[in-house]
Regions:
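Membrane-interface extramembranous regions
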Residues: 1-127
Length: 127
């Protein structure tokens, strides 16, 4: 950590907390649908391929998201940030295949870029 510029600490902590808490909150909400009805974001392709009810599938998605958020907040931040990045890119592809929600797909790609930045900052910080 001696080569890590301490001026980057604020950015690293902001990314780590944001990319850790957001998946935990969104993942937990997959069970309650307070923020939104998450099943409406599943593409018709996904609902045909996945042999589960949409709500059941979203519960599984919620568990994965909560685990990813916890990993980001743990000592495995770099691994967690890669998982969050890949997960968000997968969500963006799903959103694009709905034929709607292009704005959300772009947002998720941008958040994935933030997760990539966190992985790179963490790598330098841990070096």
């Amino acid at each position: 950590m001696k080569d890590f510029d301490s001026r980057l600490d604020t950015a690293w902590w902001a990314l780590r907390i944001g990319l850790g808490l957001a998946p935990i909150i969104a993942g937990a909400d997959k069970f309650f649908n307070i923020l939104t009805d998450w099943t409406m974001y599943l593409s018709p392709l996904a609902t045909r391929v996945v042999p589960l009810r949409a709500a059941t599938f979203m519960h599984i998605v919620g568990v994965v998201e909560m685990i990813a958020g916890i990993v980001v907040l743990s000592r495995w931040t770099r691994i967690g940030s890669w998982v969050v990045m890949a997960w968000l890119l997968g969500i963006a592809v799903n959103l694009l295949t709905t034929g709607m929600f292009y704005d959300l797909a772009v947002r998720d790609v941008e958040i994935a870029v933030g997760a990539f930045a966190l992985s790179q900052l963490t790598a330098v910080r841990e070096a």
